[in-house]
């Protein structure tokens, strides 16, 4: 959609390259930061840059002088409206943060783990689904089924031959042992990113439009 890109002050050239996938990932980060603020009593917005931008852009009021609860409810509603995200997706993030972030010092290691998890996961998906990703975006059920199989392979299959793939697979499994996301959460997350990526302009299309 690009609406966050516009609201966050990015120029038109940047907007055309961002679109729904970047908006989605931004909102996921906002939700993580809102949960962290709620659980750990963080009131310094400078520590939570994505949450600060979201709060200021959408003028989300602070509830009961506590940063987090109002912003958490707002971004949850936004993601439901735009991406049809279900409650379980948010509940699993809440549970993961509750399990892993007991004190302020836990925040950075946790966020690094999540970043590593998503980067390795999406690299693997791109590698393992590279031919399947040519399926047109309107075949939603087929894309979901292929995503489900790929994620199941990442967690279950032990016969990969490429050393880089093997290393990334082991990394994803180790990250998720700590993060604690269910397989369905991972499948839904990957499916959303893949679906949004398919809607974005290809480099050739961007060149033609210039």
Question: What residue ranges belong to the model's regions?
Answer:
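Short acidic DE-rich linear segments
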Residues: 202-210
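General "foldedness" signal
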Residues: 38-41, 81, 183
